[in-house]
């Protein structure tokens, strides 16, 4: 039976190896030290000392364990305790595209995930009056953020979750529904699909491969279904793609919560604005 001299509460060598590899650092050389450091770092000045001591004991005995971000950053000089951030696409302008890119990079550098609803961006091909050109549409912008997620990792080691959504009525929804249908997307003259190449090399670049995607369904969609009993072609295609590929997912936002279209990839938090974070 496994028994550790330095961390007697660990029941296997895997547990101790994981602790040593991911969470052990100066000032937190053992599990007990990490528990004390974490509670002092996060709770000092917020709860009475007796409660802090009780919390430390619960953690040492593994009756309560905080999220991995808290374990990793406890006592470090630059702590980033928040797991995910909600970012808002305000308007389809060069300034907003640039601002969203900056926000996304800033969050991803901390190892935090991001969630964005792109429904306010104009459909691809829309005329841009100021320049006479045409709009790229939301999907290329999703691709840009996806690329940021591919190359920007916190500490050079931790990838972050990315979430992107689009309203079911958006003019680009047909393209969005199949953007990750990789088996039906050929790559150049190779005769192979993105799906084929992904199976050969998991890290092969494919459309939105760093991003979880979902379709937003609002009150109008729900009321239409109640009146007609028909879910509509977008929903049926959504179901087909979800069954075939696992995505897009379904984001339901009805009535007083209709505008709460922002969420992180795991959906612990949903919101209308971008001031909310996930800190689980």
Predicted features along the sequence, with ranges:
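Extended catalytic cores of very large enzyme megasubunits
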Residues: 1-280
